């Protein structure tokens, strides 16, 4: 699933034309869902009405082909409940949820936060577990309490950077909790360890390659997946960087499905920093691999 970027015009308005172009590229590549309003989506800079516009537009564009998921990253429980309500009104299929923002909630507070929001909606929820960047970890004991209390908590975006955590989660929760890798540079390793999916970043610029890796890995064609992944890794490393938004938007420009515009306080890359990123992108494009017919992988069997 792509965690898509938010497209802006030169005068800092939503660029819905380029947004639609990118979503169609994702659908053409065979993605299994669209995630809006994450870190890559510059959610912290978006107005509430803009988030709602993006959800409605995405729902219109995908036309039922794949689920549309909106991220919730709020400072208060009341605001999170309100965001969930609006997601339903706007036609979203599910929610991705970070722990409370700014305030570092303890385990009990985090559990109550998730439980209260989950109980306020019928939408399925994917917990975004990223203690590295956000400072709060949802532990296995916390997951056990949440899964017992909330049937609509169904998945985790696993971004702890601990590959063994995938095995531990599978051993403890089995199919009750779907696991999606949330770190581009650990994606194939995570799939080999049993992750169910991949919430991806560079997919915004390279949708076909990303989906090919996923489909090949799931079909047991690991050597083919690994060959593409090795080519992809220098590009994937652009996602594990504080300038990931700017990096990936540069890549989207290079592949013709995005613009470089970001929203302040972010600024476009300049100088040597920009040139280094462009060199990585250009090297990747020069050696871009031919892909197998990954869309018909199972009909070939």
Residue ranges with predicted function:
Residues 46-49, 82, 107-110, 138-140, ...:
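Short secondary-structure transition/capping segments
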Residues 19, 51, 55, 80, ...:
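A general structural signal for well-ordered alpha-helical segments in protein cores
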């Amino acid at each position: 699933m792509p965690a898509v970027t938010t497209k802006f015009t030169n005068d800092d308005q939503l660029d819905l034309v380029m947004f639609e172009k990118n979503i169609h590229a994702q659908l053409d590549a065979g993605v299994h869902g669209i995630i809006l309003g994450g870190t890559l989506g510059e959610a912290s800079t978006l107005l509430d009405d803009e988030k709602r516009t993006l959800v409605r537009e995405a729902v219109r564009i995908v036309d039922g082909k794949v689920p549309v998921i909106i991220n919730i990253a709020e400072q208060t429980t009341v605001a999170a409940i309100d965001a969930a309500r609006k997601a339903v009104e706007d036609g979203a299929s599910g929610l991705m949820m970070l722990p409370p923002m700014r305030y570092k909630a303890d385990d009990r507070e985090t559990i109550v936060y998730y439980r209260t929001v989950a109980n306020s909606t019928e939408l399925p929820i994917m917990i975004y577990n990223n203690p590295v960047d956000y400072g709060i970890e949802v532990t296995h004991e916390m997951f056990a309490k949440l899964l017992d209390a909330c049937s609509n908590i169904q998945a985790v975006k696993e971004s702890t950077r601990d590959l063994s955590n995938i095995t531990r989660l599978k051993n403890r929760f089995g199919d009750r909790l779907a696991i999606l890798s949330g770190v581009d540079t650990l994606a194939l390793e995570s799939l080999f360890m049993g992750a169910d999916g991949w919430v991806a970043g560079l997919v915004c610029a390279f949708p076909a390659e990303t989906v090919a890796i996923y489909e090949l890995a799931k079909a047991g064609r690991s050597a083919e997946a690994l060959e593409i992944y090795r080519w992809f890794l220098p590009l994937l490393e652009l996602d594990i960087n504080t300038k990931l938004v700017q990096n990936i938007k540069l890549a989207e420009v290079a592949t013709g499905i995005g613009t470089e515009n970001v929203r302040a306080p972010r600024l476009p890359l300049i100088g040597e920093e920009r040139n280094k990123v462009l060199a990585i992108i250009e090297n990747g494009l020069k050696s871009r691999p031919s892909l197998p017919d990954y869309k018909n992988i199972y009909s070939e069997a």
